[in-house]
């Protein structure tokens, strides 16, 4: 249950980041998580690339895919007067991503070795190091997002661009760059979460459905509120 809470929190952080920096809800967010699991499987199992090289390739892929996702979903409809356009586009993107995952890696769930092997025993309880690793990553991400939006100029610039792009451009904020950076960061967060999930829940397209808990968490905790998301994810 604790690990489920941590994974929900990591996914909620990605949603909050996109809401606060771009002002949109991404219904393909869960599929970005599944992409992280499939990317880990593709690199480490199908091509047998391990260690630091695999980590670098994964991070580069997540950043590049985030930029690609922004240019193909958000950017073409950013000026439309139909407010639901982006929601419809992300739902369509979700379907496309699922089909591509099955086309490239197959439709059967795949197993993958834990990123951090081993376990620690405490009485009758056995805790895998993979779970401890997940807890540590979740803590780092939570602090990083909080610092970004509450302490750094870059985060405030992202929030300003989300609230009023025209006014943000007038004071010199590069709105295209802030939006691109946001999508790259969100894709990386979701991809890392998916890679962490893969050894524990298998590599499968249904990982995308995990995002529903995160939607519920941010609704209960208040849109864009990290502290509220922590409570809501519980």
Stretches with model-predicted labels:
Residues 77, 81-151, 177-181:
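Transmembrane helix-bundle core of multi-pass membrane transporters
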Residues 20-25, 64-108, 151, 208, ...:
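Short loop segments and helix-boundary regions at transmembrane helix junctions
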Residues 21-68, 72:
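Membrane-embedded helix boundary and interhelical linker motif in transport proteins
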Residues 1-11, 39, 48-54, 80-87, ...:
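Membrane-interfacial amphipathic/re-entrant helices at transmembrane-helix boundaries
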Residues 1, 5, 9, 35, ...:
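Residue-level signature of the transmembrane alpha-helical core
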Residues 15-37, 51, 80-85, 154-157, ...:
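Short, non-helical or kinked segments that cap or interrupt transmembrane helices
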Residues 37-41, 59-65, 93-101, 137-146, ...:
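Hydrophobic core segments of alpha-helical transmembrane domains in multi-pass membrane transport
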Residues 126-206, 226-232:
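Helix-loop-helix "hairpin" substructures at the membrane interface of multi-pass membrane proteins
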């Amino acid at each position: 249950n604790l690990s489920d809470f941590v994974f929900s929190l990591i996914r909620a952080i990605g949603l909050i980041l996109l809401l606060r920096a771009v002002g949109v809800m991404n219904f393909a967010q869960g599929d970005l998580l599944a992409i992280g699991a499939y990317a880990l499987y593709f690199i480490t199992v199908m091509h047998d690339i391990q260690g630091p090289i695999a980590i670098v390739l994964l991070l580069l892929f997540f950043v590049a895919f985030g930029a690609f996702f922004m240019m193909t979903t958000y950017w073409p409809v950013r000026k439309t007067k139909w407010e639901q356009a982006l929601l419809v586009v992300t739902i369509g993107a979700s379907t496309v991503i699922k089909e591509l995952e099955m086309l490239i890696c197959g439709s059967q769930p795949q197993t993958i070795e834990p990123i951090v092997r081993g376990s620690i025993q405490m009485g009758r309880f056995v805790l895998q190091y993979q779970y401890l690793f997940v807890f540590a990553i979740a803590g780092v991400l939570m602090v990083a997002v909080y610092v970004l939006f509450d302490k750094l100029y870059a985060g405030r610039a992202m929030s300003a661009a989300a609230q009023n792009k025209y006014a943000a451009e007038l004071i010199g904020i590069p709105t295209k760059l802030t939006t691109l950076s946001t999508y790259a960061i969100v894709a990386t967060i979701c991809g890392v979460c998916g890679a962490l999930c893969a050894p524990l829940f298998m590599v499968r397209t249904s990982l995308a459905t995990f995002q529903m808990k995160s939607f519920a968490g941010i609704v209960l905790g208040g849109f864009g509120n990290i502290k509220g998301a922590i409570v809501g994810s519980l």
